[in-house]
């Protein structure tokens, strides 16, 4: 008799709380991005990471067991160092590009409603990441001689640069080359032909993810007869 009563009580509880009788919806949020080496990185809740700007991230809720339920999502992204920064998104999956330095926290609140209109909400653990502050510096010489070592004049330090323009001039002030990709550079040519060895001038205007503005102007020594030497032996 006692067993029958316990069974009846269990059935009654399951009928009163159908979410526990079936597999109710769950989410497994992830963030995906490609790092500076071209590798796809996937992070989950309670994980953290550090990257540089600009950084484009795809946010995915990855819901399961949603049959028979209506799903609603609310992503919240905050910059803990900048209270004015706040992003809210209501889609299951979306992309966002980050161009500011700071420490960011991502949370997902999801709500599921069954056919009878009963609704439940749950919030996931946060995913945290840091966008590095900016750095930018250029060398004063390069040697475009085909040895694949220092063949292109480009930044020797580059981190979290979100706006960039550089131009090369000869000693008479003629512009020879310009580029807008902070990881690109000048190969020592003008109109497809190598320029002479000598001193040139670079002008760089850039802005970092931390708001820092760069104005770099300096001489550039182009050394055609110079060969880079690398030490391949262990001292």
What is the meaning of each model-derived region?
Residues 44-49, 53-63, 128-235:
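Short loop/turn motifs at secondary-structure boundaries
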């Amino acid at each position: 008799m006692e067993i029958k009563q316990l069974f009846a009580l269990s059935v009654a509880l399951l009928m009163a709380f159908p979410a526990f009788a079936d597999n109710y919806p769950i989410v497994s949020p992830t963030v995906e991005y490609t790092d500076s080496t071209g590798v796809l990185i996937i992070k989950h809740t309670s994980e953290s990471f550090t990257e540089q700007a600009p950084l484009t991230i795809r946010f995915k809720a990855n819901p399961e067991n949603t049959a028979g339920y209506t799903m609603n999502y609310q992503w919240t992204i905050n910059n803990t160092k900048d209270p004015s920064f706040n992003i809210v998104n209501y889609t299951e999956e979306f992309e966002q590009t980050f161009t500011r330095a700071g420490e960011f926290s991502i949370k997902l609140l999801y709500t599921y409603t069954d056919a009878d209109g009963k609704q439940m909400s749950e919030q996931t653990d946060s995913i945290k990441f840091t966008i590095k502050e900016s750095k930018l510096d250029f060398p004063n010489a390069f040697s475009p001689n085909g040895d694949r070592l220092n063949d292109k004049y480009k930044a020797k330090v580059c981190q979290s640069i979100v706006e960039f323009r550089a131009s090369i001039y000869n000693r008479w002030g003629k512009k020879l080359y310009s580029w807008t990709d902070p990881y690109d550079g000048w190969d020592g040519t003008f109109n497809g032909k190598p320029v002479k060895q000598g001193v040139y001038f670079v002008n760089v205007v850039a802005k970092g993810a931390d708001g820092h503005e760069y104005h770099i102007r300096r001489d550039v020594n182009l050394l055609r007869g110079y060969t880079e030497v690398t030490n391949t032996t262990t001292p």
